Each structure stands twice: as C-alpha cells, then as structure tokens.
Amino acid sequence: MPLLPRRFRKGVFYLSKISVIGAGSVGATIANDLMIQGVASEIVLIDVNKQKAMGEALDIYQGAPFHSPAIVRSGDYEDAAGSDIVVITCGIARKPGMSRLDLAQTNVNILKQITPQIVKYAPDAIYILVSNPVDILTYVFTKISGLPERQIIGSGTILDTSRLRYDLSHHYKIAQKNIHAYVYGEHGDTSFIPWSLADISGCSLHEFEELMLKKGAIDYRVHPGLTLKYVQK
C-alpha cells in the first residue's frame, strides 16, 4: 500500500486533500482511482446532484479498507476548502454525432457558474480540467478564475495518447509500458501524431518492424517484462 503523501506548509506537515467537481462516470472513476492509488488522505466529491455524489462517495469509501485509509465523502463547495488539487469534470457528455466543440457553449456556461464558488474556497489549489472541450474550458477557466496560470492544468491529449499506445500495443502485441508515443495538439480533430518520436523499447517503429522481419520472430507476446531481447531468430 502506498504511503499517503505529506505536504509541507507554514512549518508543518499535513496530509493531502483532493476535491473532484462532478460525480458522473468520469468524476467517480477519478475519485475511485485516487483512493486506490493512495495519493490523498481526503477525497471530496461535489456535484449539483447531491444524492448521486453521496452514493458514489459511499461506494468508493466502502472499498477503502482494501486499499488506503483515505476519507472519501461528498460535500458542497465550502467542503473543498484546503484542497491541494481540484479536478473539474462537470459538464454535459458528448452524444452521438456531436463534436467536442458542440459542447463548448453549454459547458462554458456551467464552468462560469462553478468557478467563482470553488475558487473562493480553494484559491491555492492546483486545478486540473477534464471537461470537454478541454482546451477551450481550460482557457476560459484561466481567464475567469483570476488564478496564476501555474495553478491550472488541462488534461489535453493524455487520453488520446493512452488510446494511441493501446492501439500500438494491440497491433505489435507488445506491452503498453514499452511503447512511447504521443498525440500532440488539441484534444479534438486537429490533434496529430509525431511518428518520428514514437518508439518501442528505444527502437523507432521502422527499426522495430525491420528487426522483426530480419530476425523472423516467431513469438513476441504481451508480457509485463517483455523487451526486445525476447525476439527469437
């Protein structure tokens, strides 16, 4: 079990607190993962639907004895006071046929409503925005919150990057942890992949494919410890 992180502020050590705004599938999953990883001593779920936030928090908290001793609870914006990190996931979900930009105005309006309330109680927190369209919402949050840019992070193309590595892992039958590839740009239709930066265990994709053809590999399965040394002649 990982040790709960300790922070140093005003001469004393204290345990960390993370608030998640939005108790939908994304917010609840993030809160659950935070509990499993043991990265916070207190996790607060905040949602306009208080009953849903309470239910999700209880489900997560009841699983805590098997993972970490973190406190998981629901609350209001004032309960986010003292948070080290605030994750914003609220907003409407994308429906079939909608682009991320179609969500822009609705989710911008939602963000405008919650920003003054959360910033009032957690002005020193690091804010991580996950809601779509994430690039636009991160920009809007920066403008209306009045917080320094160093306190604001957008999830960007991390999900796109994760999906890319999954696809490459599936294609080459190589463990994802040995694949290094990235998606750049916005989280949307204009993102792109710099293939020249992609590699598998230090080999470019072109080099890896040539190696597989040259060696006549007969067995390279997905395995947690797989490296190129397992390529057989």
Tell where the protein language model's regions lie, with residue ranges.
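Structural motif
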Residues: K17, D84-I85, I126
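Short, Lys/Arg-enriched N-terminal segments with co-localized hydrophobic residues
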Residues: L3-Y14
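NAD(P)+-binding Rossmann beta1-loop-alpha1 motif at the extreme N-terminus of oxidoreductases
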Residues: F13-E56
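Redox-cofactor binding/interface segments in oxidoreductases and associated redox assembly factors
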Residues: V86-I88, L129-V130
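C-terminal substrate-binding/catalytic lobe of Rossmann-fold NAD(P)-dependent dehydrogenases
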Residues: S145-Q151, D160-K233
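Rossmann-like NAD(P)(H) cofactor-binding subdomain of soluble oxidoreductases
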Residues: S99-R165
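Conserved NAD(P)H cofactor-binding loop of Rossmann-fold oxidoreductase domains
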Residues: C90-I92
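Conserved N-terminal Rossmann-fold NAD(P) cofactor-binding segment
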Residues: E42, I46-S83, M98
